[in-house]
Curated annotation (Swiss-Prot):
Annotated compartments: Nucleus
Stated name of the protein: Pre-rRNA-processing protein IPI1
Function: Component of the RIX1 complex required for processing of ITS2 sequences from 35S pre-rRNA.
Family, similarity comment: Belongs to the IPI1/TEX10 family.
UniProt keyword terms in alphabetical order: Nucleus, Ribosome biogenesis, rRNA processing
Length: 338
């Protein structure tokens, strides 16, 4: 009997409302957890790389990844500086190869920080030219994107990258798929020298149609830089090919030996998408000159004459462009300069 009455009392406790005494807090449940404590947080303004236990190859890869993924401009710049120092060392420390470096850092051409873009150009100049040439087409894709960027500073720094690429891989730039006409289209967007507008020229010269350009808010220096790089691009495309020395076995080597250049049959476009005129390859000087005369000479000549009248830095840059255009005519036996 005693046990049954005890059980009844225990069950009744669950349904009894406890009486609260005035001035005393409510009784805490048995499973109460105190959450009133606070922990001290440590905030690090700048991340640091832990170099302990990492060899030079892993440290190189870590900095290469940080150069692309870091949120801070200073971090990306410092990581690029580390990679640049490793590439310029003697011997160079590059565990991922030139193609691995380019794949990672090419998107930084349009980076929003000027210091990052300047450091990126220094990195490009440390790469071996013979290893850059096979990737000229890939680099040009990012360069053309930077040439049509909304920021004038990005466009100017991109022209510096194109200037470097013309120095180390000029022939590959003008002869790769899309390297000739698509790059000229990008210059057209920057300068506003539209071939469709030039076709509607009047007897007075340049048409009065609106000039669709990406802006000249930085003054004549920006336009002069664009014209100078355009002149260098045209000089590279119109440069006569150097004759190859006579080799009696060259004929048989071309037939039976493996090619010494990457993708030697790219001009056939066996496995790629169909190309339009702008995406086509123009591997020799005569083909580039022919399509230039057909689509671009009138527009560039008209824009050049207008730029020469402005004088100053723009006029001097236009004079360099004029020499490049005249040189293309003089070296062509079928055309004469007036």
């Amino acid at each position: 009997m005693g046990s049954s009455s005890k059980k009844k009392k225990e069950k009744q406790k669950d349904f009894q409302k406890p009486k609260l005494k005035v001035g005393k807090p409510k009784q805490k449940p048995s499973n109460f957890t105190d959450t009133s404590f606070k922990t001290k947080s440590i905030v690090v303004n700048q991340q640091t790389l832990t170099t302990e236990g990492l060899d030079s190859a892993e440290l190189f890869k870590q900095n290469l990844t940080l150069a692309v993924n870091a949120k801070s401009d200073n971090q990306r710049r410092d990581a690029l500086a580390y990679v640049t120092n490793q590439l310029s060392a003697n011997p160079a420390n590059n565990p991922v190869g030139t193609v691995g470096v380019l794949t990672k850092v090419l998107p930084l051409i349009t980076d929003g920080a000027s210091s990052v873009r300047v450091q990126l150009l220094k990195l490009f100049r440390t790469l071996p030219p013979q290893e850059v040439r096979p990737h000229a087409e890939k680099i040009l894709l990012y360069i053309r994107g930077g040439m049509t960027h909304l920021s004038n500073d990005v466009r100017t720094d991109t022209l510096n990258v194109l200037d470097w690429l013309l120095e180390v891989a000029g022939d590959e730039v003008v002869s790769c798929p899309g390297g000739w006409l698509k790059t000229l289209n990008s210059f057209s967007s920057m300068l506003g020298w539209n071939p469709n507008v030039s076709s509607a020229m009047t007897t007075k010269g340049w048409t009065s149609a609106p000039k669709a350009t990406l802006g000249m808010k930085k003054g004549p220096e920006s336009q002069a830089k664009q014209i100078q790089v355009l002149a260098k691009f045209l000089q590279t495309g119109f440069r006569p090919e150097e004759p190859l020395p006579y080799k009696p076995r060259a004929y048989w080597d071309n037939i039976y030996r493996l090619p010494t250049t990457p993708n030697p049959f790219a001009y056939l476009n066996l496995f790629g998408l169909p190309r339009d005129e702008d995406s086509e390859m123009y591997p020799d000087r005569m083909s580039r000159l022919r399509v230039f005369d057909m689509k671009w000479r009138a527009a560039i000549t008209s824009g050049m004459e207008t730029a020469k009248k402005e004088g100053g830095t723009v006029g001097r840059a236009a004079a360099i462009l004029d020499k490049a255009l005249k040189a293309s005519l003089e070296s062509d036996g079928s055309m004469q300069v007036n």
